[in-house]
Amino acid sequence: MLQTLQKLLGDPNDRKIRQYRPVVKLINSLEIEIASLSDAELKAKTTEFRQRLDRGESLDDLLPEAFAVVREAAKRVLNLRHYDVQLIGGMVLHEGQIAEMKTGEGKTLVATLPAYLNGLTGKGVHIVTVNGYLARRDSEWMGQVHRFLGLTVGLVQEGMSPEEKRRSYNCDITYCTNSELGFDYLRDNMATDIKEVMQRPFNYCIIDEVDSILIDEARTPLIISGQVARPSEKYLRAAQVARELIRDEHYEVDEKARNVILTDEGFEAAERLLGVSDLFDPKDPWAHFVFNAVKAKELFIKDVHYIVRNQEVVIVDEFTGRVLPGRRWSDGLHQAVEAKEGVPIQSESQTLATITYQNLFLLYPKLSGMTGTARTEEAEFGKTYNLEVTVIPTNRPIRRKDAPDLVYKTERGKWQAVAEEIAHMHAQGRPVLVGTTSVEKSERLSAMLKEMGIPHNLLNAKPENVEREAEIIAQAGRKGAVTIATNMAGRGTDIILGGNAEYMARLKLRERLMPKLAQLDADNPLGSVQMVGRGGGQGFGGTAPKPKKSWTVVSPNFYPCELSARTNQALDEVVAAAVTKYGLNRLPELVVEDLIAVASEKAPVQDPLILQLREVYNSIKAEYEKITEAEHEEVVRLGGLHVIGTERHESRRIDNQLRGRAGRQGDPGSSRFFLSLEDNLLKIFGGERVAKLMDMFRVEEDMPIEHPLLSSSLENAQRKVEVYYFDMRKQVFEYDEVMNNQRRAIYSERRRILEGENLKTKILDYVRKTVGEIVRAHVNPELPPEEWEIDKLTAKMQEFVPLLKQNLKVEDLQDLSYEQILDYLIKQAELAYEAKEAFLDTFEPGLMRKAERFFLLQQVDTLWREHLQQMEALREAVGLRGYGQKDPLIEYKNEGYELFLEMMDNIRRNTVYNLFIFTPQIVQVPQASRPAPAPTAAASPDPSSASGVVEADFTEE
């Protein structure tokens, strides 16, 4: 019935695409007219569009002509013309949707269309990429189009100064990474001066690889933290206890929730081994350490979730297989893993500011994104972000053939079948890409292929393999190439049939330039950094100095041909010119990588050396292309790239990303998944039924089975996992929404304090409220006056407002009514405040205004930090209330709101108290050694560490 209805109504996505066709027709009809314009006339269109916006026209009114202008500019500047389907992609992005575009369909070029159109408003467009290299490349490469048309283009990179970032954020179009954007948002909300704020209000955002950022990273909070000392011996002893405890006897493991639960026997055993009577004793708490130690033992597996490098535990991203140096698991988990591995335990951190990507990107009034795979997560994008997904048709039809899955009884049988399939394809000469889910499994398959004598390349998170990433990817599409990769998702690299001549030319430059220009490892603080290729540049390369360094490619016969004598001579000349300009072995390796990257891209440059490098690069590429293009034709004839999946991922989207490596831009290709009943997915989510079926039919371990029941079991398992993780992300989102409302309130208040020229009105309001609180605490109007605590009230007022010690007496209040007492004390406090201000003016005119801002910010920041910890503790505590038939989320909302109100009251009270009691002290500073300004919040996030106001130092009496 449903299928019949769908046939009658048609695919809703096709209907959506049809709506855009008339606009595409209109844009195409403008092409000849726009092409006839001179460069100056084309640039003048930007001014014309802005004037039309000022006159009341909308962006939608301008869209056809603006898109035609961008298409023409791209033709002139980049020699690239937007296809019709790319125009549709641009419209989808402009409307605040997600455009699903297959690998190799030119997402980067598509983004120029909505970026230009929305950039005309002057309110700012952010184009967000997953790593710094891509942000820089796109700002230089695609930025040419925008600069040609008169828009300003900014780039935000890690390590830039706040001033450089501010300039970039003020541009019409800004390229940045998701993490830097988030951290800058947090830093802005820790600034102690409005001049330190870098970002302006968010307007429109285009996210590249939107599924990676909004779904895979959704549960990862961005955290700015300060270090807190914690006893490392507790982690070590807890690790010893965890080694003694036995699974299923002392604790149970919930693989789905990635959690451990201690049994009664487990609690007793842990208490006995530690020699304590109660793991939860507040004076000597052990429960947290023991739970984390058991989690580290059972749920965090070496070479799957992390690797140990240079005596450090480094996280491996489960989606991309990349190492994430600098990232640490929070809440003491990282320390527990360090204790388990016997490496030095680093100190814990206290959260100073935090936000999740979910809430960060929901701050944009208009949000859009691009990815190769979003359809499977359509429901989540809709419910969480209110984003529609539109699948953009490919420019050429997809020719990839996806074979049905083969399922084996045991893992051993599966790996044997995978090895045989590789041997079969290799014998035909077809390139093969094998996706594995962990370092350990990739090495197991590698060992099997070595035994069979099949040459292959291994790409996983191990440093020695990571450094060869560009080299491995460059030849993954060559005839007979076999590549084993851990999670190809997010590697951001197209595998080109016949070999990637661009990469090969880049590596040839690198091979010759690095030994001459790069500092030797002993002097190179950056250690070894891998080739910065597409998708590279984030967290690769070891940091330990190596005794000897070589930049020569490892693979024999890597280069498709010997270079001609003329090109070799040009290469020698450019290397000599580079040494003359920069000196022998004087540059950090990363700087040389940048030189090569800029030379091999199309961004405009003035530097004569880079222009010479670019000329040599193009000559090398042209010679290699003669061979790779011929090989491309041969590989196409053989059937293209064959992709083998060795396990179903928890998300169908990641499987689709692996499959999508084959059949790019209309090339042929094929894919097949090999699975076993011992795979994690089937083991955790319902492989028992299938296992019983196999036992019943006595299926051998090396015999694959295909059965409708099996296919439906697999799909159900993946759907269950997707729903499970969606529910988890939804739960995180619902809880974080509570924090988000509070965060928005406190950050808005903080911004008002930063921007407020005169905070006196706010402070006097605080004074009146605080006096009212003190009066209510000691005077109850419903009781007779003889029961009022006038003496305590007087003492408390004198404590809060020291200037009243001389003027306020108990007898002043004796015969007054409640209202009269309140009015009298408020008036006295206001007079005391005026007197305090006059006193401070004798030190420096306007000092009270600076003091008001200083103490307000100090209290907001200090109490917000404490509040974050309280909310984290509350979140853990309410989880247990579900057993008492209470909704934990409602409890969290209600109690969190109470905590928030209490924090706001404390900010008010503490600020009033501090302003009344502090006394400035004149600090004699010799002119010659005048101190540098206090660091910004980004460098020193704790405003309580600020060194004072001018030469005054805030001290309590």
From Swiss-Prot:
Part of the Sec protein translocase complex. Interacts with the SecYEG preprotein conducting channel. Has a central role in coupling the hydrolysis of ATP to the transfer of proteins into and across the cell membrane, serving as an ATP-driven molecular motor driving the stepwise translocation of polypeptide chains across the membrane. Probably participates in protein translocation into and across both the cytoplasmic and thylakoid membranes in cyanobacterial cells. Its EC number is 7.4.2.8. Monomer and homodimer. Part of the essential Sec protein translocation apparatus which comprises SecA, SecYEG and auxiliary proteins SecDF. Other proteins may also be involved. The keyword Hydrolase does not apply. It is an enzyme of class 7 (translocase). It catalyses: ATP + H2O + cellular proteinSide 1 = ADP + phosphate + cellular proteinSide 2. This is Protein translocase subunit SecA. Belongs to the SecA family. Residues 929-947 have a biased composition (Low complexity). Keywords: ATP-binding, Cell inner membrane, Cell membrane, Cytoplasm, Membrane, Nucleotide-binding, Protein transport, Thylakoid, Translocase, Translocation, Transport. GO terms for biological process: intracellular protein transmembrane transport; protein import; protein targeting; protein transport by the Sec complex. It is found in: Cell inner membrane; Cellular thylakoid membrane; Cytoplasm. It comes from Synechococcus sp. (strain JA-2-3B'a(2-13)) (Cyanobacteria bacterium Yellowstone B-Prime).
